[in-house]
């Protein structure tokens, strides 16, 4: 290889000298040497491609992820050889027109890009298969039950390993371009997988909206780690995540809308004033959301306080999350508390409206409201909601308890006034 490159160097030097003479009689020699140099460059490209191909057999990333092991890198001896070939090809092709990627960079991106895509395809398939409903259509998504976390870890490990391969072979100004070209195919497959997951979430919105929050957190953390090590790919990953991010943003208002619709379509309430199942369902939803405070806080910050009532997604292109936006902090907890109290207020106000229409007598309506408030309070106290809602929700809960008490005692008001009427008479002299 060294002798071949030296021969090409001599040919290249001769070509430069002939071009410098600018004599018409040298044009045939210049043409012959240019063709010879072109053939030599093509041969070097084939050698470069073949060397990349030898170490591009697909691997199974799951084993590396489960063991926490580093993903394989190219041997240092091979990267040195590849760098030598690339440097020569870059010098030869630089005499022609400038292109975004040289022949060797394109060959590297094709061979290594295919290796990454094929290696990750099983993790992509697992992410889709684990999203399928197992416990019935009403089964609520359980945190960590989808394979997206393993898929993201596989992408992160392989991209960082590939960046470590690229740096010794190519010049610094080429690192970003070569990395993007190498990862482009697997990024497209990743974006396609996220679109399929987004469709699944939309089809099972009430039970699987939590999967959108999990994907948002997992993929954003992956993006931060890759950017921290490579300085690249953040925008590309953010574009792939966009459908999930928009679905997660719209979920907050859609859940409230679904709650109103379900309650307004209720045509029967317990005749004894017992609490209705939807109250427990709503509180369980809020309990589950506490496990996703980080991504939900990021969503709420982008919407603004109260923005879930009338979300504006027209500026979604500007909502690329930052590391700071995923820090829950005091304001994140406060936003979640406001959303939770809005949810509880929506629940209770619609329950009161339906009780007036479906239950006879204010006392029964009062019992109904009191029983539902009792469920709300109990489920707050018995979960992580206690620390988040103790200050924000209690005044509103107290107001509803007072209203329930007033409704219950309203029937007895006239009677109690008569029974408790006291007349004082003065003693006779």
Q: Could you describe each region identified by the protein language model?
A:
Residues 1-429:
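Long alpha-helical rod scaffolds of large eukaryotic non-enzymatic complex subunits
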